[in-house]
Amino acid sequence: FRRRICEYQERTGIDLMQLCFEQLAGKHVHLLKISGKCVRMDSKLIGSNIARQSRYELIHTTLVKFLKTCTLSDLSPEQEERAKEYLKEDSSKTVYRSDSDTLQSNLARIGNFIMEMLATFPATSPAHDLLQRLFDEQYAVKDGKAVLRDKKEVKADSLQNPNDPDATYRAKNDQKVQGYVTNITETVEEGKPNIITSVLVETAVFADCHFLQEAVENSERVTDSTIEDLYADGAY
């Protein structure tokens, strides 16, 4: 069911779940005679259901995901052997057993191998695109070699886990999340239930203030009235 909904949205640009939500919310607003002129909104970080990975684990698992889509016999004997080594490797054990110097050496080695793989195989798959993204975020190329970037250069919207490419990193107050941020808007009217009129979801790095206009437009469409008062915190 979810797959068919997503395929329909990709094909037509119409979000059926959003339409269904707005119709139901609108009927409740009308039934309960809620004016919709006063609303409040707030955001909340949502963690993705992904494992937190060390830098080496992230790079290794993304490479492995790519190698599983490749025909390894197209590689040179040396490259094929190294590819099979990475496919067999448990990256969490590698990290656990390695000291800092060994890990840095492994990161440099795997970076150069990734550069070779990207040059060898054509960019015809999502796995290739994901590996290219990871390489660009984690490495720079100097004198024909892959050089690991300083951690400070890696942005919050960089790949967190290849199993959820859209998840990003954000620290908000005391909360640190790899995932998403959702913005909820609801009606506020004394003596009447609060009806949710807008639910927006973006990657975690999305700023709260950027939700404002779309959330207001969604709410006004659902309630069929113009918002006069809006309660929100300073981030908006």
Show where each model-derived region lies.
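Polybasic low-complexity intrinsically disordered regions
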Residues: 1-228, 234
